[in-house]
Every structure is written in structure tokens, then in C-alpha cells.
Amino acid sequence: MNAGNPMRLALSHYLRTLRERDEFDRLLPELLTQMGYVPLVKPKAGVRQFGVDFPAAGRSSVDGVDELLLFVIKQGDIGRRTWSGDPNAVRESIEEVIDVWLASHVPPEYKDHRKVIVVATTGDLGQDAQPNWAGFATRHPQLRFEFWGADKVSDLVETHLLNEHLFDGQDRADLRKALVMGADSDYRFDHLCRLMLRQLGIALDGQLSEAGARQTVPVLLKALRRVHLAALVCSHWIDSESERRQALWVMERTLLWSFHRAVLQSLQERQDVQEVIREIWRSYLQAASRYYDAVAAHVRVKDGLSGYTREGAEYSVLLLEQVGLLASIGLSAALAEPGQDDAWRARSSEFATALAAMLRNHEAAASPRMDAQVIDICLALVLFIQTGQHNVARRWSAEITRRLNFVFMLGRMFPVGTDSFDDLVELDVHGTDEFKGLTRRYSWLLATMGSWCATLGQDSAYENLAENHANAYPDVGSQLWHPTADWPSTWYFEAAQHGSGSTEAPYPLPASAQALRDRIAQFNATGRLRWEENSPALAIGMWPLDFIACRHFRTPVPASMWYYLDSKPSHGIEQNSGTAVPPSQDPDD
């Protein structure tokens, strides 16, 4: 393998991470198809196959001879221990192919084809097993043997799966650039995104391009699989460079844009489209699990994440980013459809508990410095509610509200109402009164935390906030955004609030919490906020996508997630009266 070729290096890394079942054995038939072979059966676990995981018939590109390839699939490196001595060892599998499959299972139409036994693995043939391999082949001169290790398969994948028939020159160039630049923690995979847009037929504005409008469903399915493969190569490559946050970002973007493409033509309920989307979903879960494993130990240590930055403002930004990531991972489990991904769904409490531990050990997470961090805060609160940790939600929302009130009264260290970290630094270092006024003209946090406190029964924290907002900092504009019925058209492609929805501005904060609850109840009675009723993701059992999109694109979490808090169903199915009341006190979670 060319060590200077980042594509092949990435492919080789990627292949070495695949499981034998459901991953490597799904890739090989697709590869063989592109090579001009016809896989005769699909690999099946639990079915006795007499050594052959799957056969494939075709014509050799080397000498033009018709041949029947008999694949024996293994995982990892082949050494002396995995060569022989176990019923599932390589030698025993090959002998079963010779003794049974070749003797009685060759289809009649292929009896004259040349027979080639191919041992395919995600690793290498170790030096200690190479003499055994050579000796075995010498003792069976009537047969041909080939070993396809990770390097060999990566060469074939690049040649046949990532070739000019699937990726044109520009796509291949963009994929290579994404691999080279992917280890940069600030890189946002512009090159990979351009590849995805071209493959999926999406224009820069999120609508169908001319090419996309011409795509048939079979063509789209192939494009989705190609995009998935390109994303996997990038994700695994940068994961190997210890950039798991970047690897997770790639899988988030691929999942969301693939689903957006399906929604553009209302194809998401087609079974064949769903199957491909769920394959990408499973890849997202794997990336999410790897990211969680990387940070889990740090969040349980007092200020365990402080080693990644020194500046106070930067530390707050880092912490709230981790809050949003852990919360979206937790919601991917908590809101998973029963009967699907049950093992992952069972981990929802684990993720919520880890997030609660992080908040205890990192008190600065209750001091947001950017108004957009309200998104991460809301995702965390929704996770706590969905997993039954109501008291954690109450305590943390009240603490954030108290600190928010304090910094606005102080006139320093308040969350800036822009997305610019430079504005935050400017404010802290030498912000003028005029600049301070500009950066706190509007606040999502005021309305959001005030309404969270009211619905969670944190009346004291709310009423203190409302009083001081009215008297000490009335210049701060409180506002709240609500999606409108057309929200799915952009939700999975970009930040939805810039081109759709409606904003309550100013958002009134009455003196008493009960007055705000009464106002929320009146709002609920209109039925305007049941945004999930229009969710194409919820309709097919993939509601977590809506919340992953909130964090990824920085779209505010819809207020209905806490406006209907007294009877919010786990999957948005049950109806309620629309009456907002503070929840009853329950024991500590």
C-alpha cells in the first residue's frame, strides 16, 4: 500500500475497525458487484455454510477466465492461534470448503468455473502464519487461493467503489482534501460537504438541484450509500487521529443531510430509503459511543475538562459544547423507538447520569457566556426530564437563572447575543458601554430560563429574575422562537430559525411565576406549538434526529418541549389538556 496516499491509509484504518458480521460482510458483496462479479447469496449469521460465507461468480480481470470466488470472512490479523486449532479457525474453515462445499454445493451452472478460495479479513496475514498459508496452498495445487487483507481490500475499494464511476474527479479530490485536513479541530469539512451536496442532488439553498430533480429512487439509494461510505472513511480516519468530536460531527452531518434529501421528495417512509438512513443512523451511534467513551472519565472528575483551556470565557464555551454533545447523545437513546436499538436505548439513564455528574463537577457550566448556548442547556434539561431526573433539571435551571440575573445586574460577564467568540473577548477586555448595549440587546436565555423555571416550579428563581429584569436591566430584550408548520423543510439542512418560524419579541416576564404559567396555558390552548406532530423523523421512529439537528445547526429547541411539561409524552404520542402547572415535588433522583 502506498503509505503516502491518505485515501488508502484512511480506508485501511477504516477496514480494520469493521466487525466481521454486519459490517465487513456487507461491504464485500457491494465491492464484488462493482468489480463485475455476482454475489450468489448474502452472508448470513447462524446458518451453516460449510465454510463459505458467500460465493461470487464472474470473469477475472487478469486473464479473462470465468471463476467462482468462495469467500471465507474473518476479522483482524491472522496468526498461528487463529490459523488452526478451533472449529472457526482459518484452516478448519478452508478444509470444510474443500471437503463439503466443493464436493456437493457447487451450483451446476458454475461447475466448469475456476474455483478460487478467498480468505478475506480486516487485518493482515501475520508472519508466523505465512508458512502455514503457503504450505496449505502447495498441498492443494488443483485449487487457487487468495488472501485479501485490509491493505488489499482498501486498494480494491479505492479502485472500484471510490472510482470515477461513483465519484468523479472533483469528488475524489474533495474527499482527499477532507482526509488531509480532517485532523484540524476547527475544520468543518467543507470539501466533504460539497461532495455530499453533489452526490445527493442538493443545491446550496437546501432545495433540489437540477441533477437532484432527475434522480430516480434507485439512483438516490446508490448516492446515499456512496455518501455514507465517504463519511465512514473520513470519520474513522480522523477518529484514529484522536479527533473524536470531529468524527462525530461528520456522522451527524451525513445523517441529517441524508434525511433532508429524503424529506425533500417525501421519500423517508419508503422501506428501501429507510434501510439506508438507518444504516447511517447506526454509524452515527457508533461514533457517538466512541466520543462518549473518550469523555466519560473526565466528566466525573472535579474540573476534569479544565486542562483543555485556560481562559474563563473559553472554558465556558468548551463546557457548554460538551453539555450539548452529551445531551444529544443521551436523547438519541432516550427518544429511540421501542423495539429498535434497544441496547442503545437502555443506556439513556447512563448518559443522563454522566451529564449530571459533569454539571456537579464543572460548576462553570451554569454560567453561559454566549446566548446561543441556550440550545445546549435546553437539550440537557429535556434529557433530564425524559430520563426522570426532574430534580437535577430543577436545580440546574434555577442555578443558571440566578447566575444569569446576577451578571445582567452586574453589567459584566453576561452572555453575548452574537455567535462571535471575538465579541465575547472584546466585551471582557475593553468593551465600551455602546458595545455592551449591542451585545445584550436581545436574549434568548432570559425568556427560555424564565419559562423553564416557571414550568419546573422554581418560582423564587423566576420571580427574582422577572423583578430585576423589570427594574435593573429593562434594556435587555427577552425573546423566544417557535417553529411554524413548515419547519421540516429546512430543519435537517441548516439553522431553521433564520428562514422560518415566528419570534415572540419582546417576551413578557410577568411578576409572578403563576402568571407566566397561565400565559403558557393560554398559548398551549391554541395548539400552535405541537411542532412534533409535523415531525417526519418522529413519524418513522427516529425522533432523536430533530434534537441532533438542533445542536448541530444551532437551532433553538422548540418551547413546546417544556411548555407541555406536565404531561409531555416520551414519544410525542399522547394528548394532554394543554394546562401548564408546576410539577409536583418528587424524591431526589
Locate the predicted segments by residue.
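Mixed-charge (Asp/Glu-Lys/Arg
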Residues: M1-D589
